[in-house]
């Protein structure tokens, strides 16, 4: 029986690895979309000697130092600049960094799963990120290699959980780096505070005091990456511009950078339930299964004080609070759109850990009696079936024909890039925001928006017919003379 289980485990592990490879390969060839292109302007400008600056397409269409509208931070974009400095292809080279973080995310979940509830928990946890569906809206996560900050932030949060029991200071630093991958990672702090409290010895006020003693250094270190970034911004911009930068950052954080019709909590929860490659009711049922197993496990260990139990409770409590912070904020933030990208760092980091907690709960129940011993595995099998269904759905989605791919974009942009090089055109204006952004960045020109004052007299790239003279044309895009 043990041999059969071992064979089954490794066959399933190999199948899951194959699914990851298929999704990664599909993601590398996916359309280079506007948010990725907007992010790529920062490492390009840094290498061009213009500083840590975007093209400012959403900030007046001028070179903008430490642009607050770039929500993907230096934790991601500085490594991208390092890769590009060695002459790597701009798009594929840039996408290697999120891919590295994706691998780190899966590896961290495997470590947590193995440590907490054995190899089967590790396998299920490694499947959860594949089950998440970031597509389906105008601001997607297309896959593991998108040049965005959500996956890197999630990976760093997971590794913070890995090191927290023995190196809380390092966990704090990793959380700080996650914040500088995506500012929304700040919402993870309450979860880590609760995790530290669970690990602290004593009871009552003594435990709170111990938590404060253990938590001050990680909290300080969590702020170090952001402090360094803002110090660099101060010396790059000067006092007056730095104050404007802070105001812009505060405005962006408060407003989410979007102006949409107010959304409701039911709409948000419905969107989250639909963000998996299974029907929403299956996603909800899976969540209920996880909660039942976790609660059952916690009830089963009442009165036990083993270190292994405390570590499991730490993970469950910290991840539950972390997940609630992300989903709760997003659900109640009426000014934010129905984009699962917003809570994605918390979903990708903490939901898989809660699945680990569910498997741990099943194991704890197995020690309580015949009924619990039979019920736990049945619920885990149902949980596993849901994940298998979702992962297969993700793999099947990669076979759906795409209207545009990275390869087709390259072919469309080739004549425009050649024209930009020959004419030395420094800027092109995108008309409108959206599909026209990425071709401009791929052409090698700086990108602005057609209606910005700074773009007066600048040629415009569009997918529509030109109303002025056509300067150069590809199969999908063309450059029109300035009106």
Where in the sequence are the language-model features?
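Signature aromatic-anchored transmembrane alpha helix within multi-pass, membrane-resident enzymes
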Residues: 9-13, 127, 173, 219-224, ...
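Transmembrane-helix motifs of polytopic, lipid-linked glycan transferases
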Residues: 14, 92-117, 159, 295
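Membrane-interface transmembrane helices that cradle and orient dolichyl/undecaprenyl
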Residues: 156-170
């Amino acid at each position: 029986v043990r041999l059969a289980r071992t064979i089954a485990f490794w066959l399933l592990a190999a199948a899951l690895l194959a699914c990851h490879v298929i999704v990664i390969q599909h993601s590398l060839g996916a359309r280079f979309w506007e948010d990725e292109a907007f992010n790529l302007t920062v490492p390009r400008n840094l290498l061009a000697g213009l500083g840590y600056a975007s093209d400012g397409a959403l900030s007046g269409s001028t070179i903008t130092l430490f642009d607050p509208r770039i929500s993907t931070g230096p934790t991601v974009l500085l490594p991208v600049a390092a890769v590009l400095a060695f002459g790597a292809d701009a798009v594929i080279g840039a996408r290697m960094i999120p891919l590295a973080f994706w691998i780190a995310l899966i590896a961290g979940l495997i470590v947590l799963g193995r440590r907490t509830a054995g190899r089967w928990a590790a396998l299920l946890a490694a499947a959860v990120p594949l089950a998440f569906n970031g597509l389906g809206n105008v601001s997607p996560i297309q896959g593991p290699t998108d040049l965005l900050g959500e996956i890197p932030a999630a990976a760093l949060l997971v590794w913070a959980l890995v090191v927290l029991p023995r190196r809380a200071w390092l966990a704090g630093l990793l959380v700080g780096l996650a914040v500088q991958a995506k500012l929304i990672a700040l919402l993870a702090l309450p979860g880590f505070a609760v995790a530290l409290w669970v690990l602290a010895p004593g009871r009552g006020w003594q435990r709170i005091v111990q938590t404060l003693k253990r938590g001050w250094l990680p909290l300080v270190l969590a702020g170090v990456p952001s402090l360094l970034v803002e110090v660099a911004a101060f010396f790059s911009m000067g006092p007056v511009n730095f104050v404007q930068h802070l105001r812009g950052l505060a405005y962006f954080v408060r407003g989410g950078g979007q102006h949409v019709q107010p959304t409701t909590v039911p709409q948000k929860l419905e969107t989250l339930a639909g963000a998996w490659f299974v029907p929403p009711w299956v996603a909800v049922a899976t969540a209920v299964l996880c909660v039942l197993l976790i609660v059952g496990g916690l009830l089963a260990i009442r009165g036990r004080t083993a270190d292994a139990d405390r570590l499991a409770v730490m993970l469950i409590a910290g991840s539950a609070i972390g997940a609630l912070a992300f989903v709760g904020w997003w659900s109640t933030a009426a000014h934010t759109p129905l984009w699962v990208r917003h809570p994605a760092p918390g979903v990708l980091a903490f939901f898989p850990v809660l699945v680990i907690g569910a498997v741990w709960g099943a194991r704890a129940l197995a020690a309580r009696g015949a009924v619990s011993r039979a019920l736990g595995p049945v619920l885990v099998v149902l949980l596993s079936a849901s994940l298998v269904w979702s992962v297969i759905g993700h793999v099947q989605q990669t076979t759906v024909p795409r209207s545009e791919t990275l390869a087709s974009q390259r072919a469309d942009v080739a004549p425009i890039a050649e024209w930009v090089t020959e004419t030395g055109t420094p800027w092109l204006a995108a008309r409108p925001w959206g599909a026209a952004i990425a071709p401009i960045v791929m052409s090698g020109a700086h990108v602005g928006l057609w209606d910005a004052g700074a773009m007066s007299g600048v040629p415009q790239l569009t997918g529509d017919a030109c109303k002025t003279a056509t300067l150069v044309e590809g199969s999908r895009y063309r450059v029109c003379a300035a009106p």
